[in-house]
């Protein structure tokens, strides 16, 4: 398939002001805190410092529709609803922009949009209780796509940060060294691992990975930990049998 780039009109969000909100939050309050701090804090701030304007329109079949309508002359009307856009257009015939929002734009609103925020109300019981939340656990590959954008959007729209701590996990890779996915068919069923090697062996294998590091799946290592666990089990049984306890 030939991929041919073309010029087209898109919707952008100017990021200068949003970026500054996140950078000032980190500089003045040290938030959010990254675990592990190295290298993720530096990666996060460096990306913000070099941030470009964000293209938020996508030519996809699914997603949140862009709330913009056009009349026959090409004038644009941005509104919460089609009826409101029609009022702004003084009853002119309108058609909605066919594009949808970038999924990360929608996801950036998650911290507060799920807590009763409707675009105006910024004080609900859920918002007071859960924003900011204690911690977000996420992969290092979406620090830019999700974490930074949640910080910027939450700070901009409701005036506080979305979470205090970000716990960064590694990515689980298949035996081929690529991220596990259904499309690659390189995933493993953890239940099968439990049945084959035991829960303890699988847990030891996962616990042996350095914090925040990627995991390249290796059945041989799990088998090694199973053999080790068997030795501990047999040694414990021997001690208990000879101590008169069961």
Predicted regions located by residue number:
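Residue patterns forming the tRNA-binding/recognition surfaces of aminoacyl-tRNA synthetases
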Residues: 1-72, 107, 142, 146, ...
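Long, hydrophobic, amphipathic alpha-helical segments used as structural scaffolds
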Residues: 59, 240-244
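Alpha-helical recognition segments enriched in aromatics with Gly/Pro capping
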Residues: 59-63, 67-214
């Amino acid at each position: 398939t030939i991929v041919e780039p073309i010029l087209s009109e898109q919707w952008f969000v100017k990021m200068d002001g949003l970026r500054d909100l996140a950078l000032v939050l980190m500089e003045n309050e040290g938030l959010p805190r990254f675990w592990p701090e190295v290298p993720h804090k530096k990666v996060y701030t460096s990306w913000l410092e070099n941030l470009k304007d964000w293209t938020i329109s996508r030519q996809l079949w699914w997603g949140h529709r862009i709330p913009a309508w056009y009349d026959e002359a090409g004038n644009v009307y941005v509104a919460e609803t089609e009826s409101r856009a029609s009022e702004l257009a003084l009853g002119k015939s309108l058609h909605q922009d066919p594009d949808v929002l970038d999924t990360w734009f929608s996801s950036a609103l998650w911290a507060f949009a799920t807590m009763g925020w409707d675009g105006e109300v910024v004080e609900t019981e859920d918002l007071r209780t859960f924003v900011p939340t204690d911690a977000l656990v996420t992969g290092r590959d979406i620090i830019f796509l999700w974490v930074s954008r949640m910080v910027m959007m939450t700070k901009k729209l409701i005036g506080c940060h979305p979470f205090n701590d970000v716990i960064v996990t590694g990515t689980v890779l298949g035996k081929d060294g690529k991220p596990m996915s259904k499309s690659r068919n390189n995933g493993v069923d953890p239940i099968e691992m439990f049945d084959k090697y035991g829960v303890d062996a699988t847990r030891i294998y996962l616990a042996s990975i350095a914090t925040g590091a990627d995991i390249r799946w290796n059945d041989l290592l799990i088998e090694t930990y199973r053999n080790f666990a068997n030795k501990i089990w047999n040694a414990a049984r021997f001690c208990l049998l000879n101590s008169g306890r069961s």
